[in-house]
């Protein structure tokens, strides 16, 4: 009797171990079969908007090593974006991130044709059964960076180079101003609009115009902060980055901090939704507390007590 029980127990244990391996390996195996497509309006090395999304995708790949990514940069909005998304679907993408505001309508059209593919759009105001919208709430982060700028400035003149006078950007500037005045009642913020999301010549001209007025801390809300950050550095002014931490290297002396989107955890969540069959169309909004944003490492010129105040 005992001779027959031993192999029986071993057999049962083997089956249990195999079952546990299947349970553990299941999600990883599913992730290995997932193709994710993402298209960018500009360069993935712009130190700003596009780089932040590209960094988020790379973080997702680290979290889910089996995921395959199809990534295309410098895709114009409109018909070109629609064509690129169609090609991604044909290549087997089951999740597509249309990473520009102007990609919304093309994404909706492609989503209607391929209901089995899930689409994600940042900042969109329309959804579809297979399209989710998402964004990060930034005024809190701008308020905190305003505090840093307000304590750093020596002229009490702060400046911002901004693409367009839309409500979302104006809310950020107002938050920055309130943060600055909370620690320095004499601080004031001046703004120049470029009228476009990417034009280095206009951005440099706007930055220089503000610096000529005595501004000594420059912030930026355009796709790539590199030009404004470099201009401030050349003129021995301080700078505040936006979108990505990538522009920090262009201002080793003047950089005081920045506000960066950290999309990695959210993109990982999206991928898991698709592989787990748990997708639902929704509008997602988070902020610093949700790890959708971070404040860049502070520059050496920022006093320790200011860092403690902002990070408390």
What are these regions (language model features)?
Residues 3-4, 17, 191:
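Short non-domain terminal segments
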């Amino acid at each position: 009797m005992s001779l027959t029980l031993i192999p029986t127990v071993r057999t049962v244990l083997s089956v249990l171990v195999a079952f546990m391996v299947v349970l553990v390996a299941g999600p990883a195996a599913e992730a290995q079969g997932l193709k994710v497509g993402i298209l960018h309006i500009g360069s993935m090395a712009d130190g700003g908007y596009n780089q932040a999304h590209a960094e988020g995708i790379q973080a997702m790949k680290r979290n889910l090593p089996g995921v395959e990514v199809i990534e295309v940069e410098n895709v114009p909005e409109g018909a070109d974006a629609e064509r690129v998304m169609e090609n991604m679907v044909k290549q087997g993408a089951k999740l597509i991130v249309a990473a520009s505001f102007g990609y919304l309508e093309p994404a909706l059209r492609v989503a209607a044709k391929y209901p089995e593919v899930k689409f994600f759009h940042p900042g969109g105001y329309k959804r579809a059964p297979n399209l989710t919208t998402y964004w990060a709430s930034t005024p809190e982060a701008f308020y905190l960076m305003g505090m840093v700028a307000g304590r750093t400035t020596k002229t009490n003149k702060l400046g911002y180079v901004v693409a367009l006078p839309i409500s979302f950007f104006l809310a950020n500037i107002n938050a920055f101003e309130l943060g600055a005045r909370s620690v320095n009642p004499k601080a004031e913020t001046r703004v120049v609009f470029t009228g476009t999301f990417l034009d280095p010549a206009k951005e440099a001209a706007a930055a220089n115009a503000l610096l000529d007025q005595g501004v000594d801390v420059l912030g930026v809300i355009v796709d790539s902060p590199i030009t404004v950050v470099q201009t401030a550095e050349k003129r021995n002014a301080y700078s505040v980055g936006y979108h990505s931490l990538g522009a920090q290297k262009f201002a080793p002396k003047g950089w005081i901090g920045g506000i960066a989107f950290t999309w990695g955890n959210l993109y990982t969540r999206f991928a898991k939704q698709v592989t787990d069959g748990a997708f639902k169309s929704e509008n997602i909004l988070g902020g610093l507390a949700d790890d959708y944003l971070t404040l860049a490492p502070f520059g050496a010129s920022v006093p320790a007590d200011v860092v403690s105040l902002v990070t408390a």
